[in-house]
Amino acid sequence: MSNPALLVGYDSSDDAAVYRVSDEVAVIETVDFFTPIVDDPYLFGQIAAANALSDVYAMGGEPKLAMNLLCVPNCLPKDDIRAILEGGHAKAVEAGCVIAGGHTIQDNEPKYGLCVTGFVHPDRILKNVGAQPGDVLVLTKPLGSGVLTTAIKADLISPAARDAVYAHMATLNKKAGNAVRSAKNVHACTDVTGFGLLGHSYEMASCSGVTIRLHGATLPLMDEARDMAEMGIIPAGAYRNMDYVKPHLTVLPTAQQVFLDLAADPQTSGGLLVALPREDAEPLLRELQTFAPWSAIVGEVSELRATALEFD
């Protein structure tokens, strides 16, 4: 439905809807929930909440109000249900966001997430559209959560690497979002989640009418992610992501398969992907690296060539 107050809808593959309520205020609305990817219920609540809140940061806003979405089987202990909600609440408090209630239904498998409301000035919305030739792409979190959570199920990674991936997934994009909002000339922004870096880069390129080239050798990776990918520990979602982008992707002869696999890896609560001119990316990187030292330039934007996406 067309409405002049709807500033961002579903047509541009953006992370959230944005609705203008005045000349000074626009409302950001998003929803996200999923099944557990970790055994600890409190940690699951933290990760699910961080993942849902991320969409507001990706749009250049600040989350302010949220509602719980919870699906629980009859057999799930009440202590586990409480722990899930407490984990989500802890992340909302960290974000400065109030959870005002929610809705619970019975289901065969646990699911948890948030419906989040945030605010942004109508003239300062960050969108998936707008990447320009000459821009570079900055990524604020390392890749590999899909590969590593798959490896954890088989007890293949070290306790240190396991704890590190959990910490990355539970980390809010709040500080990164603040840094991006303060940066000059940000032309486009999204967060890297289920479609992987390849999928989300393709959507940005396609919606912007440009070609994005990603550099495998510069991708920041979580500890032991490369080792697991080289062993063939690739989640099914990575193959689906590759199938999705394949018609729009040129893989150059210099590309290494392991980096291509990790670029397709579906992420949970991944980082922000930001398009801006190189001269403005350098001060942004300096700011990001004070709290996220893995932040890196992972690609660049050019005029549209044969395909929307290139990988070397």
Give, region by region, the residue ranges found by the protein language model.
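Helix-biased detector of long, well-ordered alpha-helical tracts
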Residues: 1-312
